[in-house]
Amino acid sequence: MKVTLIAILTCAAVLVLHTTAAEELEAESQLMEVGMPDTELAAVDEERLFECSVSCEIEKEGNKDCKKKKCIGGWKCKFNMCVKV
């Protein structure tokens, strides 16, 4: 009886680990596919552009010199826009 229970639990654990590994591989393969449109990255780019220009416009309306928002992650603020360095 104990041996059967141990065997069943072992098989269940192996099945769970195998399923998890398969899901990770599938996710990696989708990320590595060439030619897929990178819409999420494009959305982030547009967001950065918007945030940078809006922050600069707010400072201009307050009669202050425009101190451009510091962009992070390989980006810099130039001409009221975040651009990739």
Swiss-Prot record:
One term of GO molecular function: toxin activity
Classification via InterPro entries: Hwtx-2-like
Organs and tissues of expression: Expressed by the venom gland.
Prodomain positions: 23-48
Presence of keyword Secreted: yes
Keywords: Disulfide bond, Neurotoxin, Postsynaptic neurotoxin, Secreted, Signal, Toxin
Disulfide linkage: C52-C66, C56-C77, C71-C82
GO CC annotation terms, alphabetical: extracellular region; host cell postsynaptic membrane
Signal peptide: 1-22
Subcellular localization(s) per the UniProt record: Secreted
Source species, domain of life: Eukaryota
Family membership noted in the UniProt record: Belongs to the neurotoxin 12 (Hwtx-2) family. 02 (Hwtx-2) subfamily.
Main function: Postsynaptic neurotoxin.
Protein name per Swiss-Prot or TrEMBL: U4-theraphotoxin-Hhn1h
Species for this entry: Cyriopagopus hainanus (Chinese bird spider)
